[in-house]
Amino acid sequence: MSSNSFGKLFTVTTFGESHGPAIGCVIDGCPPGLALDAAEFGHDLQRRATGKSRHTSARREADEVEILSGVYEGLTTGTPIALLIRNTDQRSKDYANIGQQFRPGHADYSYWHKYGIRDPRGGGRSSARETTMRVAAGVVAKKWLAERFGVTVRGYLSQLGDITPAGFDWSAVEDNPFFWPHAAQVPELEAYMDALRKSGDSVGARVDVVADNVPPGWGEPIYGKLDGELAAALMSINAVKGVEIGDGFASAAQKGTEHRDLLTPQGFASNHAGGILGGISTGQPVVASMVLKPTSSLRLPGPSLDTAGNVVEVVTTGRHDPCVGIRATPIAEAMVAMVLMDQALRHRAQCGDVGTITPRIPGQIDG
């Protein structure tokens, strides 16, 4: 069956194409009584939006949310919440020359062989434009998690090309267009991206997400493990080619004495596992990372094929991001938040009455 829906109890279905008249989503399973106003979507949507700096696509969309259902007098009613955003800055003529050509590194070839038809305008359904509605749904999940459990979900760009942060400060993340945690490096990133854009090439990136105050117990072994669903959610984002939970692939070089997260009455001594053991949250910060490939939308010509199998030279015109990772932080946050809300509701449904005599310990030792 088609896979345009996400989640089990907190379910999100997105629809629409990059250059269609609108994009939207239907959120089902949100508990009633959550205060919700259209203006609340603006902050995260603008964090994801294009046209905010010279380092992202020049496409400018207002991204104003219309709430069509599921909210009455400012409160969710428990019925499906339908959200709509109208596309206003499509430039489909930029894609006129590639309607019968396959852009290397894009979903053109695979979509063509699956469906026998594709919408070439801006990538159609495979465009990152679709993630706008994930961010919108993530606003709902973030708010519910914060109000119900005090959970916060925050992300940052942890690598741009071969550049990594020289320091870390959460307060710096929202003060630059890269979501970078070390303010002193922003000029270096600006210069790097200016040179990259001038060359016509692109580059990959890495985004880290941290969810604080997640209670222990969320996750459904065996096939609904929290880390498994986080990995699937992050892998569903455009251009993502790798996901880590906690130390991830670095665990291969670690000894057990290093990787194990010791428990003490004062708290966990470390968090190499990323706050998840056995597929269940431990009460530590949940830490997930994703790596995004360099975009294949390049001004540099490259050989390819057309739908008839003829050799062609493809040059991608239009407005594109030289690094899709720059705008990916709010998307990753949204996916993590939606997984956590879905798992919270599922935990409440099955194990809401479960209690233990074991005291909860802090997620980490203070100091």
UniProtKB/Swiss-Prot annotation:
Keywords: Amino-acid biosynthesis, Aromatic amino acid biosynthesis, FAD, Flavoprotein, FMN, Lyase, NADP. One of its GO terms (biological process) is chorismate biosynthetic process. Pathway: Metabolic intermediate biosynthesis; chorismate biosynthesis; chorismate from D-erythrose 4-phosphate and phosphoenolpyruvate: step 7/7. Its EC number is 4.2.3.5. NADP(+) binds at residues 48, 54. It is an enzyme of class 4 (lyase). One of its GO terms (cellular component) is cytosol. This reaction introduces a second double bond into the aromatic ring system. Homotetramer. This is Chorismate synthase. It comes from Stenotrophomonas maltophilia (strain K279a). The gene is aroC.
